Amino acid sequence: MTIKIGINGFGRMGRLTMRAAYDWQDVEIIQINDPAGNAETLAHLMTFDSIHGRWHHEATHIGDAMVINGKEIPCTQNIKTDDTDWSQCDIVIEASGKIKTKALLEAYLKQGVKRVVVTAPVKEEGVLNVVMGVNDE
């Protein structure tokens, strides 16, 4: 079964997530949202990285979609979580750095997302913060 992933926030953490997950056979990136960049900008940032160098896949764009190896990934530029359709995602990677409260994160779950992975600490009761290799058992 393929796990469908959406990424909200395509800064450093969002792009590193994409680089890591793109080649996994059981994972498909199906949605990217970043208010700061259109599909053309995101494709350029995906291709060139000052630390990791050029990505081994070709990332281009067609309209509002990033195209990687012929596969189109819709890109939106919405500020509010509710303005992006996350309903087809099994998991959303919340990498914007802005959505860090339980109330704001629940907007994803209301759209049918099964899990949300936040790339920043959530400093609120009742939210599990897991650091791989430290408290992931």
Pin down the residues of each PLM region.
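N-terminal Rossmann-like NAD(P) cofactor-binding subdomain of oxidoreductases
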Residues: 1-137
